[in-house]
Amino acid sequence: MSLLHTFWRLPVAVFFEPHEENVLRCPERVLRRLLEDAAVAMRGGGWREDVLMDRVRKRYLRQELRDLGHRVQTYCEDLEGRVSEAEALLNQQCELDEGPSPRTLLQPPCRPRSSSPGTGVAGASAVPHGLYSRHDAITGPVAAPSDAVAASAAAGASSTWLAQCAEQPLPGNVPNYFGITQNDPFIRFHTDFRGEVVNTMFENASTWTFSFGIWYYRLKRGLYTQPRWKRVYHLAQMDNFSISQELLLGVVNALENVTVYPTYDCVLSDLEAAACLLVAYGHALWEGRDPPDSVTAVLSELPQLLPRLADDVSREIAAWEGPVAAGNNYYAYRDSPDLRYYMPLSGGRHYHPGTFDRHVLVRLFHKRGVLQHLPGYGTITEELVQERLSGQVRDDVLSLWSRRLLVGKLGRDVPVFVHEQQYLRSGLTCLAGLLLLWKVTNADSVFAPRTGKFTLADLLGSDAVAGGGLPGGRAGGEEKGYGGRHGRVRNFEFLVQYYIGPWYARDPAVTLSQLFPGLALLAVTESVRSGWDPSRREDSAGGGDGGGAVLMQLSKSNPVADYMFAQSSKQYGDLRRLEVHDALLFHYEHGLGRLLSVTLPRHRVSTLGSSLFNVNDIYELLYFLVLGFLPSVAVL
């Protein structure tokens, strides 16, 4: 006889009644499930499907919980390892002998280190972490050379925490000096160029103070009325134009990040995208000689490529047909009115159709065969399918040269610019910035008679500048090949060789705003001065000339200050912070286009610089473009 024997043997439904021979041999959960199934079967309808779906959801939920637990365990183990490494670093006794006071040292690269009596390592004890470069944040700071440490030990000052923890140098021959002007010595630094310059400047200011122009003063006055920012940026003394070191570093940090797009899938900087566009544009120049095979090689060709590009742009503007963007901006993007973020999020990373049709560089590249077709226009379905299958446009010069330059960095994952159009847009904007730099920096010679009073000693002190100049230097000569009086002006060529190239060698992810924060500040100021608003792109009044209301416009809107608040405020979410950053980036693009579209860009830049930033001549302009500020000394 079976263990479960029914009292009534009926074929309709099997219910087990109490019986002396019935023995229950199933777990409680199985019995509960049988009861639920019976109840569902009796109710009918959609109850059975709901129960089955609940079971499926519970099974997937258990699997997800197990995966989550595994990931949390892995993360905790990794965190424990990193904490152990940090404890080991903190426990290490890496004491350095005392050296000279933290100062950015000056020494030309042609001189041996031992020949300079003040050779040492520059440190920035009060520089915020946010101002360090991304390369330093990943690989660690540059180690101090052994002879520099020995010289530091002979002079007698304490080293900074950054210098103590820098035990391994960066791989390769990475320069730690930059040259800005031909008539000044090179600036030698440790890891953070601008942070150490600012720190040295404020350390030397014992009997004097600095003013940085009316733009910085208006920013200080606007923040002074807000108790939180007054405390964060150490604001005081509203009766003078001086600002605190914290506020200056906050502004410079915001300007450096204008073209640094904060997304995980951004694989190219705007400088690398511009190099790809330039090498495809100038492919005819490589006939008869070895073409460039790296971004560094393209950057070295900037003095030859940009003049040719400027001439072609001038001819294209002279033969312009069709409407021009508001304010006669030939470098404008026709974004949709509801565009809030820089990165296109739909349509296969394509912008709104018509975005590039009023940009002079796109028209020029289309005529020269750099771009096979304008992005978003007249795309044939068969061609689009073929492009997606092959990964590049048929006979696409830009894709071929991009792969040549970037295959060593990205392998096979080199983006196609006409499909991932954020790279095309960033490259075009960077090209516009480089064109503006070439036009304004080579407008006059640094050896001409000066009208300004700023000198490099105002930044680093007279002791650091003395004895560290170039051959001849400001005392009455020029370096061979860069003569201002005996040859054509070559300020831009000097920057390319001794500033842009060395910085890219240190950090291949550097962007144009990190190289020239002063250029970003000028462009944003010009955009705000015009009254343009990225949230009202179709407003015709927003593209006007702006009259002379420079100060009135600046007092009403300051996207740089908005981004500073978004960076340091916990009230901003990630999307809101990204929106504020992109608004600043849109202002930067619009301002560059306006400055380049005027007949004399040098005159417009000079007007903005002299009225807002203490810039009076080409020598001061070069330092302002590189540093993002220009101090004017005032005795206490």
Curated annotation (Swiss-Prot):
Compartment(s) where it occurs, according to its Swiss-Prot or TrEMBL record: Virion; Host nucleus
Record-linked InterPro entries: Herpes_UL25
UniProt keyword annotations, A-Z: Capsid protein, Host nucleus, Host-virus interaction, Viral genome packaging, Viral penetration into host nucleus, Viral release from host cell, Virion, Virus entry into host cell
Top-level taxon of origin: Viruses
Keyword Zinc: no
Gene Ontology annotations for the cellular component aspect, listed alphabetically: host cell; host cell nucleus; viral capsid; viral tegument
Keyword Cytoplasm: no
Residue segments, region Interaction with major capsid protein/MCP: 1-48
HAMAP family: HSV_CVC2 (MF_04025)
Assembly description: Heterodimerizes with CVC1. Interacts with major capsid protein/MCP and triplex capsid protein 1/TRX1 at the pentamer vertices. Interacts with the large tegument protein/LTP.
Biological role: Capsid vertex-specific component that plays a role during viral DNA encapsidation, assuring correct genome cleavage and presumably stabilizing capsids that contain full-length viral genomes. Participates in the interaction between the capsid and the tegument through interaction with the large tegument protein/LTP.
Protein name: Capsid vertex component 2
Organism from which the protein derives: Human cytomegalovirus (strain Merlin)
